[in-house]
């Protein structure tokens, strides 16, 4: 049983009875299907959004380029920043490629081969998105090496040598 299957099984079990009522059948089927699909992200409205193999590989290339040598936790957080932007089309492009190729946003080596550690970090960012196991909240849109951005968001957390900033409006809501 893969980690996605374990996570979704636990989620199904925890949702089986809410307020004494059985879980909605359609929701159960959707969650069970997620067990067998490592390409689904649970968005802010609790709907599953699908990623293609090409999109996942693109995220892996960015993470490998931006965070080679950093911890799995840092790499997962960087992948989460990409997902955060993708799932916020009011501020950012609504495609993974659009987010990644937006001018001056992410470094990417098109010829790089992401290693297993990076693939695990990206996989974790996808399956744990919008759960209590996310490395960073969905309002974190920026990161950089060595220090926080001076003009984007507010300092949130540093992981290894990478500094993540949160949208200042997130703290108001």
Feature locations, PLM:
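Bacterial extracytoplasmic/cell-wall-associated proteins, especially those involved in peptidoglycan
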Residues: 31-173
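Cell-wall glycan-active module
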Residues: 1-50
